[in-house]
Amino acid sequence: MDALFETYAKLRKRMALYRVRAVPNQNYRRDGTKSYVSALNRFGFQPTKPGPYFQIFEKSEEAPSMPVAPGVKPGHVWRGLFKKITGQEEPGEVTAEDQQNDSEYLCEVMIGTAWTAERQIVKMHFDTGSGDFWVRDKSFDPKKSVTWKLAEDKSWKVQYGDGSSASGIMGHDILIIGGIQIKRQAIEIATEMSAQFTEGSMDGILGLAFSKRNTVRTDGEADPQRTVVDNMMAQDDIPPEAELFTAALYSNIEEDLRSFYTFGWIDEDIVKASGEEIVWADVDNSEGLWMFSSEQVTIDDQQVRIEGNKAIADTGTPLVLVSDQVCEALYAHIPGAEYSEEYQGWTIPRETEVDKLPQFRIAIGDKEFIIQKGDLIFAPTDKGVFYGSVQSRGENSFDVLGTAFLKSIYAIWDQGRKRFGAVTKIEAFIPPTKYDRPRLTDEDRKELGVIIGYGDISSTFFEKRA
């Protein structure tokens, strides 16, 4: 590894590469059920546990050869995501209010001529589960970029099960990310957006999955464009060992400012601090996702084998989604934990001491990695319980290892060699008491200028001020 790190050091010096800070989004508010509904909308899988939300599918000979979402079975058309309404026989529509519409972290990139007045800085959500790089039309003005070139015959559209969508035009421009200048990057500008896409703080999404998941069409025909990493790899100044990107995401509120991504190099300090060698797992990208073998979990001393099981590493999902078998085994080790049909998820008693939670390990290839105990708790609810970070994947065919898991490792997406790497990330533990602050009174709200309460949660952390 020393020779490899020396190569990265030289590359960083020659190209002035730097860490891309993943800055905590101050408007992001954790909500367990909303995050789960967002996952249903994102992946399109049918829940296997009871709750208000469900999918409707229909068998059809006209179903696309590649399903519109990973959870949609071949030969089926996804009619949408719906919710049960008390007192009604007909299901209701899922709206922006039912789901999480913002990103936990925001990352700055530049579009346009580097280091000139024409460049435009946008705050993006880095998403390893999608393949489009799109920005809101109000966040990027192509008329101000002398290097922008519109592709008049191309369009794009991202659409989800609740009927929400974002769509618009496409062109090419220069992108600067982590010090790397990428020429002729396909940039999609959202000129039409549903409420789900307009309510968040991000300027857009930078997809880091494979190009198979890109939605661009030329004259109406599918024409997937190269992703950011595809274009980075195609450049002569990027050697084969640099055809990758990495992420170090931190869970503690005090640690958040340290979260970052790198493009083209692996951070030597973090790897050496772990005292471990990087563990690699081969990636199956046939669905355009970062999918690898994950056939085992361990809860304390209980080992659960799932032959042939696969998982994806997904920065676009905050939760960890696993089989019902694994969920039941995990929560059986937490006294008082139970499944809530109301919240459509597993819950943990509020009085649970974090250090009494079980050790939960998930395999990446041949090695298991532990989820830090504090990250097993996702968010409080209004019923005196916590919503767990580990939830059911329903009928989805693979696990989803979201940021609740990724915060425990230094993650490496090696696109050139089609493999995913990880080492344990050392992090001092701080109990998540800041997610459980005292509830505000009406007088408190007036004094603090609180104008919006998120769900039924009332605390200084989960409410927005004027």
Regions found by a protein language model. Name each.
Residues 180-181, 185, 302-304, 367, ...:
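Well-ordered beta-strand scaffold positions
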Residues 256-308, 382-385:
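Flexible, small-/acidic-enriched active-site or ligand-binding loops
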Residues 297, 306, 315-324, 329:
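Long, repeat-rich segments with strong aromatic
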Residues 125-131, 312-318, 324-325, 402:
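A short acidic Gly-Thr/Ser loop motif
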Residues 307-319, 397-413:
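C-terminal, well-structured subdomains that either form a transmembrane helix-short loop-helix hairpin
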Residues 424-466:
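C-terminal helix/juxtamembrane-tail motif
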Residues 187-195, 376-380, 425-429:
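Short, solvent-exposed aromatic-acidic interface loops
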Residues 1-277, 328-363, 384-399, 464-466:
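Non-catalytic N-lobe/flap surface of aspartyl protease domains
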